[in-house]
Amino acid sequence: MWLLPSFGIVMAVTSKPVWLEWTVVSLVKVLMTVTRLIPIRWSRALGKGVGRVLYRFNARMRRVAIRNLELAYPDWAPDKRRAVARQSVQSTAELLTEIGPLWSGSWSKTSAMLTVEGIEAVTEPLASGRGVIVLGPHLGNWELLGMHLATLGDLVALYEPLALKRVDRLVHRGRQRTGGRLVPTTPRGIAELVRSVRRGGITGILPDQVPKDDKAGLNAPFFGVECFTATLAYNLIKRSGAAAVMGTVLRTPTGFHAIYRATEEGVYSDDSLEALTAINRGVENLIVGNEAQYQWQYKRFRCRPQGPVDHYDWLNSPLIDEGRVSS
């Protein structure tokens, strides 16, 4: 399920007047056009600039990122956590400014900037007729990950329609431009996805997204911290018999680098908690060494039902030392 960047402007105006929707669509199109016409290094510089502003003025985003890094890396010095938190916000903003060349630019130009590691983890199961489920966390450019997967086989991905219909059409066109197909996040859509994977197709799932429904996950360790982990990917793997693969697309100085790795065997366990723990471990392995490109602004360490510790209860305090370990 490839989602729009979590701080996306369109999400904030889903119930606003039509004129505002037109304004948002126009701004998005202008941004896409500008970033499509300029070199990738310039669009990234623009994203970093936006990220610096967000980090400076969006206290909640900054505090969540620092808090998550405190939980994941308690041994890091406060200065290092703050630096990585700032880089993380900039990385998320870069994703927004990279959308233009990805959704409306030349795919041949984009693919020429993409190097790939471990592609056999995807192509070998497909060649044998087995479907593939790629688990791609909020790391690097997950939009490009979905687009690249669509060039490797028949991609069907879950998609939650946006209330802004014009923006929804824009997103659809962009995400399907390399041949992928989007289905709604409904029982019928999930059934269609499972059928496609059983026939030897591909899908992509964000394994580190916290579901709202208490019945849609289990609390499993992530960087040693118990947090709510979705069972969607696990259930799809069990229902479809697909091969599970970890995947990400990271930024490099000259473009992008895709990484595909077969998951550990624990992902296929009949014990759902063991499987979710293995999935989280796979996400950790992708993040380590690439922490600055992970979306730490997301409240990943939530528990459901609410556990004995709320890792984010202190965020509302007006007085806070953001360089202090606050656990």
Predicted regions and their residues:
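Catalytic core of membrane glycerolipid acyltransferases/transacylases, capturing the structured
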Residues: E94, S128-P187, R199, K212-P221
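Non-catalytic C-terminal accessory region of glycerolipid acyltransferases
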Residues: S6-S15, W19, L54, R82-V89, ...
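A conditional alpha-helix N-cap/helix-loop micro-motif detector
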Residues: A112-V116, L164, V183-P187, E226-C227, ...
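Membrane-anchoring hydrophobic helices of lipid-metabolizing enzymes
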Residues: L3-G136, D168-R173, R177-G179, E322-S327
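Generic structural "secondary-structure junction" signal
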Residues: R56, P101, V116-G118, N141-G146, ...
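Soluble or luminal CAZymes and related metallo-dependent hydrolases
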Residues: S26, M61, L114, T185, ...
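Short amphipathic alpha-helical segments and helix-helix/interface helices
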Residues: I119-T123, G146-M147, D168-H172, L193-V194, ...
